[in-house]
């Protein structure tokens, strides 16, 4: 019976608790989600707990990702989405070589002309680092991004604990529907 578990990336909030029926009718009829159907065998993790609660659902876990969980390889896989040139990714590796897990926080903490000065200090091309900085600043708009780890611990570890216990996980994105958000979270979790 319980031979497999699922990790569902629910970008449109359709699988967790309930979803609007896909009929042409204007009435707001809902269909049950996995949590209503399978109860404790499903856990809802939310990147946007405010949105989840606004739909009348209490998430099992709120998802927070700290900047130190984002690797340069995660950014490299986002190269097309962020429209980064290869030298910008190389610049990220230069920042990482010096600052390790704090590379992203250190980079994003730079402001204005400080970014060019920072580039010179680490031996990166100033234009590349400025472009990388500008494009990665978008991550600061994601409410689930935090400077330090959250009290619940590492979200990847928490999801794996649930899956190991045979509990299916629905990861709701709430209002966070950009492709950048989806790809970033998928990279970090997988």
What kind of feature is each model-predicted range?
Residues 2-8, 12-190:
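P-loop NTPase motor domains
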């Amino acid at each position: 019976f319980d031979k497999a578990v699922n990790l569902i990336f629910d970008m449109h909030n359709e699988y967790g608790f309930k979803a609007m029926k896909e009929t042409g009718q204007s009435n707001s009829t809902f269909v049950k989600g996995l949590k209503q159907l399978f109860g404790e065998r499903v856990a809802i993790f939310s990147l946007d707990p405010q949105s989840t609660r606004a739909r009348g659902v209490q998430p099992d876990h709120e998802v927070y990702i700290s900047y130190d969980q984002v690797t340069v390889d995660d950014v490299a896989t986002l190269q097309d989405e962020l429209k980064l040139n290869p030298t910008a990714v190389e610049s990220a590796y230069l920042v990482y070589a010096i600052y390790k897990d704090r590379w992203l926080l250190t980079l994003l903490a730079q402001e204005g002309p400080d970014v060019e000065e920072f580039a010179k200090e680490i031996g990166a091309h100033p234009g590349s680092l400025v472009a990388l900085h500008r494009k990665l600043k978008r991550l600061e708009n994601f409410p689930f991004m935090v400077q330090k780890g959250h009290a619940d611990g590492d979200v990847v570890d928490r999801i794996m604990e649930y899956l190991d216990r045979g509990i299916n996980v629905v990861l709701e994105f709430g209002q966070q529907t950009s492709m950048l958000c989806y790809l970033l979270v998928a990279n970090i979790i997988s």
